Amino acid sequence: MKYSIKAPAKINLSLDVIRKREDGYHEVEMIMTMVDLADRVDLSLRADGGISIDVSEGFVPSDERNFAYQAASLLKKRYNVREGVHIYITKRIPVAAGLAGGSSDAAATLKGLNELWQLGLSVDELATLGAEIGSDVSFCVYGGTALATGRGELIKPIASPPPLWVILAKPPIGLSTADVYNGLKLSEARHAKTAEMIAALERQDAASICALLHNTLEDVTLRLYPEVAHIKEQMKRFGANGVLMSGSGPTVFGIVEKESRVNRIYNGLRGFCDEVYAVRLIRTSGTCPNTDENGML
């Protein structure tokens, strides 16, 4: 028996770092939403009880370092599952991009194995398990649009944004999340207007959403990687209504209100950036529009 499920990418409409905690993590306040760029996770039962994983991209770990593998291992051990699983991930989300590709793959694996292994776990239970794997996994289990607090694992659903286009562009650079956080000086950091962003989402006010986009980590990344600043400048020049770096980067996204501008921005960025995507915001939780439905095969 097999199960196939989509794993959508996320972007941060707002990311604020509040303080560094005693456990080494940072206290954050983030507004995250999903876009219809998605990996595909195919799960196949193994009678021998083993866990194996293959990934379409060769530079993605295909062992216990992979979040999807960790998700399967956690479920199997926690609930004493005898059956094993083979996981095959078809990657479409750029790797190490600030788009939570690995976290979304883990969330999809948790949800898919809950069905395949007939565990009967609630979404809340799956999200709690996800927090043991990574900070973004809980959000990816819920999907939709949410306010994430704590280290990112405390999730509160909020209003989804209006149906806008999003252009994603990832420069060809390697980025260390640890370096970005280490370079952050909280005493000098600019902070997000989180409550105002939530209110703008509730009003479906696209202009205010674009104006309130904020990422406290962005100034650090722009200082370390000028290529990211260049992409931001070009997106604005080509006509994006709002531009921001997602997560710790390096991917930059532009929100576009008018469909007529999408091709101009996309084609303009393709001139100097190989990984460019034109996508839509997902307004419902769980699955991706315009993709195969999740389910048993």
Curated annotation (Swiss-Prot):
ATP binds at P94, V95, A96, A97, G98, L99, A100, G101, G102, S103, S104. Pathway: Isoprenoid biosynthesis; isopentenyl diphosphate biosynthesis via DXP pathway; isopentenyl diphosphate from 1-deoxy-D-xylulose 5-phosphate: step 3/6. Its EC number is 2.7.1.148. InterPro entries: GHMP_kinase_C_dom, GHMP_kinase_C_sf, GHMP_kinase_N_dom, IspE, Ribosomal_Su5_D2-typ_SF, Ribsml_uS5_D2-typ_fold_subgr. Gene3D superfamilies: 3.30.230.10, GHMP kinase, C-terminal domain (3.30.70.890). Coiled coil: none annotated. GO terms for biological process: isopentenyl diphosphate biosynthetic process, methylerythritol 4-phosphate pathway; terpenoid biosynthetic process. It catalyses: 4-CDP-2-C-methyl-D-erythritol + ATP = 4-CDP-2-C-methyl-D-erythritol 2-phosphate + ADP + H(+). The active site is at K10, D136. It is an enzyme of class 2 (transferase). Keywords: ATP-binding, Isoprene biosynthesis, Kinase, Nucleotide-binding, Transferase. One of its GO terms (molecular function) is 4-(cytidine 5'-diphospho)-2-C-methyl-D-erythritol kinase activity. The keyword Lipid metabolism does not apply. It holds the Pfam family GHMP_kinases_C. It comes from the Bacteria. PANTHER family: 4-DIPHOSPHOCYTIDYL-2-C-METHYL-D-ERYTHRITOL KINASE, CHLOROPLASTIC. Belongs to the GHMP kinase family. IspE subfamily. Catalyzes the phosphorylation of the position 2 hydroxy group of 4-diphosphocytidyl-2C-methyl-D-erythritol. This is 4-diphosphocytidyl-2-C-methyl-D-erythritol kinase. It comes from Shouchella clausii (strain KSM-K16). The lineage of its organism: Bacteria, Bacillati, Bacillota, Bacilli, Bacillales. The gene is ispE.
